[in-house]
From Swiss-Prot:
Function field: Functions in the N-end rule pathway of protein degradation where it conjugates Leu from its aminoacyl-tRNA to the N-termini of proteins containing an N-terminal aspartate or glutamate.
Cellular-component GO terms for this entry: cytoplasm
Gene that specifies this protein: bpt
Family indicated by similarity: Belongs to the R-transferase family. Bpt subfamily.
GO molecular function per UniProt: arginyl-tRNA--protein transferase activity; leucyl-tRNA--protein transferase activity
Name of the featured protein: Aspartate/glutamate leucyltransferase
């Protein structure tokens, strides 16, 4: 798959090996590039199509020497037909209103994020995220991006309670879910799945072909929910292809330890002291 970038040649960097937080006994590395301010959206489009994810003004993807477990996943919205159970999830959240807002951080969002992280990912790399970190995650960008807030319908003229929030990039061929978080004490809503389904609906309404979901790891219990979305495409060496029934029931890659959620990669863990110039 050939991609032509419209700006000066990008410089790619490689993080130094560090202990893998997801597969005990292994090491992880990432390749990344800084998105240019001039035509960041176009470059981000091209990189996303070949498996990169965005964190602030950095595009990255796994580049582990001995492991290829992380696979990019996207839902083909134009072909997607909601199942009965998926329609029920949307129905259980019909008391929520969707609000598209500018990519500007608020304390209300940050407080929701803190509750989510402390409950769902207390031992993860983002658990210690500070307010300045959150502001940078949302606002430090050179691409087309926005926030979607899901709020209870207000009983007065003020805004309803914030229940969920997601940072979304708008691409030429779809929507890319950068990071989502939600009230952790409302399991009946299935808010994680609801956010994905609602963005598939948004993509359909706007004639956008895909919704990019980040990385999927075969056999990971925490990531098994992604395989329940069908159809789903995953990126292989030969390009994007539909996930097969066999892949949906895939066992974990062979190796020590259990898999952890590769979608919860720290959003910006490549520090200058840890990189090598690939030029």
């Amino acid at each position: 798959m050939t991609q032509h970038f419209p700006t000066r040649q990008l410089r790619f960097f490689l993080t130094a090996p560090t202990p893998c937080p997801y597969l005990p006994g292994r090491e992880e590395r990432k390749v990344f590039a800084h998105l240019p301010l001039s035509d960041g959206p176009i470059v981000n489009d091209s990189l996303t199509q070949v498996g990169f994810r965005r964190s602030q003004n950095i595009a990255y993807r796994p580049a582990c020497e001995t492991c290829r477990a992380c696979q990019s996943a996207r839902a083909p919205a134009t072909e997607y037909i909601l199942s009965r159970s998926e329609r029920k999830i949307l129905g259980r959240n019909d008391d929520l209103e969707r609000h598209l807002v500018e990519a500007e951080a608020t304390l209300e969002q940050f407080e929701l994020l803190r509750r989510y992280l402390l409950t769902r990912h207390a031992d993860g790399g983002m658990a210690e995220m500070t307010w300045p970190d959150y502001v940078a995650m949302v606002e430090d960008t050179a691409v087309r991006t926005h926030l979607i807030e899901y709020r209870r319908k207000s009983l007065d003229r003020g805004p309803g309670d914030l229940v969920a929030c997601v940072l979304v990039d708008v691409l030429a061929d779809g929507l890319s879910l950068v990071y989502s978080f939600y009230e952790p004490d409302q399991p009946r809503r299935s808010l994680g799945s609801f956010i994905i389904l609602d963005h598939i609906v948004q993509a359909q309404q706007n004639a956008l072909p895909y919704v990019y979901l980040g990385y999927w790891v075969p056999g990971s219990e925490k990531m098994a929910y992604k395989a329940r979305f069908s159809p789903l495409e995953i990126l292989k060496p030969g390009g994007w292809s539909l996930m097969s029934a066999r892949e949906r029931g895939a066992r974990p890659p062979r190796g020590p330890g259990a898999l952890k959620d590769a979608c919860d990669l720290p959003l910006s863990d490549a520090q200058p002291a840890d990189i090598e110039d690939l030029d």
